[in-house]
């Protein structure tokens, strides 16, 4: 299913039942939009789930700066997922599936983001992955319960992007890699751009 929009909606239902105060904004559109809206109605979470549609990248970056948490629920079919870099750079806590390509390289679980167990690619709206849903719900509930911890993770996420994954670091690492290749040495870049990521 790739994006797994059912997971945030089901998570919203779980957290609402437990008394949490939040709003879930869902951005974008696609093949599962109508199913997603139907699920929201079926679960009675219209008051906490808003469909915001598609917008320009600049507008989306502004929206990220207004939010505390970014849910990235895709499965192993996602690839790198540049939106992970973008939300971290804009000060969101990234709560991401462990199957997204960039997650092992960008996120240190509990330090600069949160990682939950990915939903199986074979799951669907009718047959959601309960283990993934419970893990996602637990991570978000922890963040909502620990505002100070959430702020620390947001700060660390932004620092990771500014210090380790910045354009300046990318240029430095590229020069280091070129030098190593020209001189027949193995690259010593362990993390960030030009690493084995």
Predicted features, each with a name:
Residues 61, 84-89, 103-105, 111:
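Short alpha-helical segment that forms part of, or immediately flanks, the ligand-binding pocket
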Residues 54-55, 62-67, 88:
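Short alpha-helical donor nucleotide-sugar binding micro-motif in glycosyltransferases
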């Amino acid at each position: 299913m790739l994006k797994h929009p059912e997971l945030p909606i089901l998570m919203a239902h779980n957290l609402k039942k437990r008394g949490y105060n939040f709003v879930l904004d869902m951005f974008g559109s696609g093949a599962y939009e109508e199913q997603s809206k139907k699920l929201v109605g079926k679960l009675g979470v219209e008051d906490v789930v808003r469909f915001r549609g598609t917008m320009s990248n600049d507008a989306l970056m502004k929206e990220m700066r207004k939010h505390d948490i970014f849910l990235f629920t895709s499965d192993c079919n996602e690839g790198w997922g540049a939106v992970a870099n973008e939300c971290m750079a804009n000060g969101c806590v990234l709560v991401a599936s462990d199957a997204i390509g960039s997650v092992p390289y960008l996120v240190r679980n509990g330090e600069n983001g949160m990682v939950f167990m990915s939903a199986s690619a074979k799951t669907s709206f009718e047959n959601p992955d309960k283990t993934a849903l419970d893990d996602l719900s637990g991570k978000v509930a922890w963040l909502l319960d620990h505002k100070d911890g959430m702020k620390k993770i947001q700060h660390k996420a932004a620092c990771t992007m500014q210090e380790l994954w910045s354009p300046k670091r990318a240029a430095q690492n590229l020069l280091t890699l070129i030098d190593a290749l020209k001189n027949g040495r193995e690259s010593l870049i362990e993390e960030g751009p030009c690493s084995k990521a």
